[in-house]
Regions:
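Active-site-proximal mixed secondary-structure blocks
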Residues: 1-145
Length: 145
């Protein structure tokens, strides 16, 4: 997945990675069904990959890293990306500079009644993708090229 919001730290005695996915994003459908997820980094020289992944929805362009080889992603293949799977069955691109695999420990949407500032209220008032859900994953594997 391509994320703009996230963090890494320690929670419940575990190394944890937190990601946020808006309710109308295609990725959310997969996150809600998944037991594991991967987050990848790419070299700066691969900015075309990041731009593509951050702007093209899997709804419109079947990205194989979310759907497996049954739905090949022609654009990702044209970018030179190849899908592989972890021992847990979680997809990732072999060209990633770093892959972090997480097991989901917690998932819930933000509840507006708990917003303590006007910043999220203002943002969501004009945000067509809907409110975000927070996913906290225990880091179970990490690979670096």
């Amino acid at each position: 997945m391509t994320i703009g919001w996230g963090g890494i730290g320690t929670l419940w005695g575990r190394t944890a990675l937190t990601v946020y996915v808006a309710e109308k994003r295609y990725t959310k459908e997969f996150m809600d069904k998944a037991e594991y997820f991967t987050v990848m980094t790419f070299d700066v020289k691969d900015s075309k990959v990041l731009n593509y992944m951050g702007t093209k929805s899997g709804r419109d362009d079947d990205r194989s890293a979310t759907q497996g080889d049954a739905c090949p992603d022609k654009k990702a293949q044209a970018l030179g990306l190849h899908t592989a799977y972890t021992a847990n069955g979680t997809p990732y691109y072999t060209e990633a500079a770093m892959v972090i695999e997480c097991k989901i420990m917690y998932a819930a949407p933000f509840d507006p009644q708990y917003f303590k500032s006007d910043a999220p209220k203002r943002m969501y008032a004009n945000f067509p993708a809907g409110i975000h859900s927070m996913y906290i994953g225990e880091v179970v594997n990490a690979w670096k090229k």
